Regions:
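Beta-rich carbohydrate-recognition and catalytic domains
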Residues: 1-169, 174-218, 230-279, 303-353, ...
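Beta-rich accessory regions
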Residues: 10-15, 257-492
């Protein structure tokens, strides 16, 4: 029986979410039914549909005590809203609420949600602090019940010295023998993050197994949103470090990184061999993956970052969205990302320009839109820079600039329309190919996702530009550049 708090949230979203027209939302990126969205949660395939829950405040476009919103899809592009799944309505979570978590299927066909339950607790010095534990809820894909045994993991289940104030974000899965496994993150005794593995035979009674990886103050401070999965013969530990320093390909603040290595299941030993940044853009955090029925490893993420959440469109009825889900593979020891192939099925009218030579700023016939799948292939050459402007008009644009001499690709949304003092420019290094470059760009009203060289690097950003800014232009400095441009309209 849903609680009064949950019923209130469901009634509110049913009234106010239904009042938001499809035209007010992106075409193929998931947004909250109404109000606020941050981390995607419970990304899973269950009863023939993809389920994507999310951190949710239905009542306002800002963070507040967390609920779990809920949506389902058959193609990862069109999302149907279901009633709010979880609310802060139990003794384990009736403070800041139901934080991030995940989902898996149980032996009896029910769906098990595992989430971070948070309450405020008075400390000996009189200070109120949030205490983080892990709880579960069991349901049928629509309604979920929290058992009386919650929380199922607390500080007493952690190694000595690990913090009860920073212990969160369980990612749950089933082993081949049916065992339930979950990786969480916690603040270790050295003041930096650790990824901790727990297991259970039934999903209710959990025990500590091992510390999979420690930050040792090398990759930021506290970690968030862990995931642990096999991929193309390797094992991946993916997570979101906080308070990173700009070393190598990493940038200040929140990042998403992946440790790639091997895993000994008998000893539960993870050995990292490589580490990489998962997105070099501005708005990308809180990743989570699931295994599709056909064996693809598919990733979702929050198309936002915490530092710019106060920069909202005036009068917006919703805030926050998730990326277009991405397929993951390993190539030459690194993860590559491509948009899910379901996007190809909605390709409409094709506009194609082959071997076009440009230098001064140039528009190409038919190449313009704010909802499109665009591929630009730059041939090797002696140009000094290539500049692509998107969502452009006389006053606005977001640019991608490639310097073949440094192999730097720069995303700049300074002229996208925001007046806020936030990060507007990021650069990442792409593989040097004597000036050759391939960019696949997903445009969806107020977002841009860039896949460089078949997904070897990605850059993601939210943009604040009026929808009337539709133009796309091409230019080069130093000498001419030769391009092939392909754009698909999307039949959504």
């Amino acid at each position: 029986m849903p609680s009064e708090i949950l019923n209130k949230a469901r009634a509110y979203e049913a009234k106010h979410g239904a009042a938001i027209s499809p035209a007010e939302r992106p075409a193929y990126h998931m947004t909250p039914y109404v109000g606020w969205l941050n981390d995607p949660n419970g990304f899973s395939y269950y009863k023939g549909k993809y389920h994507q829950f999310y951190q949710y405040n239905p009542y306002d476009v800002r963070w507040a005590p967390m609920h779990w919103g809920h949506a389902v899809s058959t193609d990862l592009l069109h999302w149907e809203y279901l009633p709010c799944a979880l609310a802060p309505d139990s003794p384990a979570d009736n403070g800041p609420g139901c934080f991030s978590g995940s989902a898996t299927e149980m032996d009896d066909g029910k769906q098990l949600l595992m989430y971070t339950s948070v309450i405020a607790e008075k400390q000996p010095n009189g200070e109120m602090r949030d205490i983080q534990t892990q709880s579960i809820a069991i349901g049928d894909g629509l309604d979920y019940e929290k058992p009386a045994c919650n929380p199922v993991l607390t500080q007493k289940d952690l190694p000595e010295g690990f913090s009860k104030f920073d212990f969160r974000d369980p990612k749950i899965w089933r082993e081949t023998d049916g065992t339930y496994s979950a990786v969480t993150v916690c603040l270790a005794e050295d003041g930096s993050g650790a990824a901790v593995l727990f297991q259970s035979k039934d999903g209710f009674d959990w025990h500590f197994v091992t510390v999979l990886e420690r930050c040792n103050n090398q990759y930021g401070k506290m970690w968030e949103c862990p995931d642990f999965f096999p991929l193309d013969g390797k094992q991946v530990l993916m997570l979101g470090p906080m308070e990173m320093l700009p070393k190598g390909e990493f940038h200040n603040g929140h990042n998403v990184i992946a440790f790639i290595g091997s895993y000994d299941e008998a000893t539960h030993t993870f050995t990292k061999e490589n580490v990489q940044l998962m997105d070099g853009g501005i708005d990308f955090y809180a990743t989570q993956t699931t295994l599709a029925p056909d064996g693809r490893r598919i990733m979702t993420a929050w198309l936002q970052t915490w530092s710019d959440t106060e920069d909202k469109p005036k009068g917006c009825k919703w805030f926050g969205q998730t990326i277009c889900p991405r397929e993951l593979h390993i190539k030459d020891g690194r993860i590559v990302q491509t948009p899910v192939r379901e996007l190809d099925a909605v390709h409409g009218k094709r506009i194609f320009h082959e071997n076009v030579t440009v230098q001064s700023e140039t528009s190409l016939e038919g190449i313009k839109d704010r909802v499109a799948d665009l591929t630009v292939t730059v041939q090797p050459g002696e140009y000094r820079s290539f500049i692509l402007k998107l969502a452009a008009d006389a006053d606005h644009h977001t640019s991608l600039t490639y310097d073949p001499y440094t192999s730097q690709l720069t995303l700049d949304r300074s002229y996208a329309g925001s007046r806020a003092d936030i990060v507007h420019t990021r650069s990442c290094k792409v593989r040097s190919q004597n000036g050759a470059l391939k960019l696949r760009i997903l445009l969806d009203k107020n977002s841009i996702e860039v896949f460089a060289n078949d997904g070897e690097q990605t850059m993601t950003a939210w943009i604040y530009t009026p929808q009337s800014a539709q133009d796309i232009t091409f230019a080069a400095t130093g000498s001419d550049v030769n391009l092939t441009v392909e754009q698909y309209e999307l039949n959504l």
